[in-house]
């Protein structure tokens, strides 16, 4: 395809990761199924470069985001007699995140204006899917808004679609949007990453450059960085770099010495805030992870499963 014919929408937004493929599925049978919902500009089943055996997953890229939405709305999908799991693909860099594989229905929205009301959040986010609950967090004592909120959808795909977008404007102000994870989901992401570093990163052209020995789709694990928090976190989520600890209200542990102050208020001036800066909240961790019903905002730019048919990295401990 020439540049003049290339779709205008970014490729990353038009790409789906397809997990749980039958080992019998080929590029052709994958294409035959998913082209029912639009024009495919690329379709590939990822294979071991040596044995040519399917890795149990692949990617399809549509000509438009609208076609991607149509395919996702048609779930569940069955290819060659096997139910598969399509997810919006995330970039190689983003897929390195410890919990990139987790599917959640709740997002954290930080950096919202004090005069932001529920209808502002609903007006913006309802374009991504059906909203079930909107919670604007306030200080229990003073009632003052703390600068962040949670929005819960009825489908994880709404969350996946939101977090791969780099810019979000609510009530006339750029905000920080991330997946919101419960304490249990955080623990799951941590355990799936720990000790498996380097077992599943891959890159290179379409079929080559794979690392690791496990086959995705038959119990094999793929992972990115070992140890939740990686070198920045010293083994614990956040650590010195990405902490969302501290003592907030409502049983939530928000805080940290950077983008949240010790009372759990969002402090946009102190954060490494900006769509192109990775969105890490700088500063020390100021509290433990204890307590029930906690939600943590994960590092920015996660979407679920990551990768590209040309240069990709899959960073999860998900099993099919």
UniProtKB/Swiss-Prot annotation:
SUPFAM superfamilies noted in UniProt: RNA-binding domain, RBD
Database matches in PROSITE patterns: RRM (PS50102)
Keyword RNA-binding: yes
Comp. bias regions, Low complexity: 308-320
Keywords: Repeat, RNA-binding
Coiled coil: none
Cited PANTHER family: HETEROGENEOUS NUCLEAR RIBONUCLEOPROTEIN A1-RELATED, HOMOLOGOUS TO DROSOPHILA SQD (SQUID) PROTEIN
Name of this protein: Heterogeneous nuclear ribonucleoprotein A1-like 3
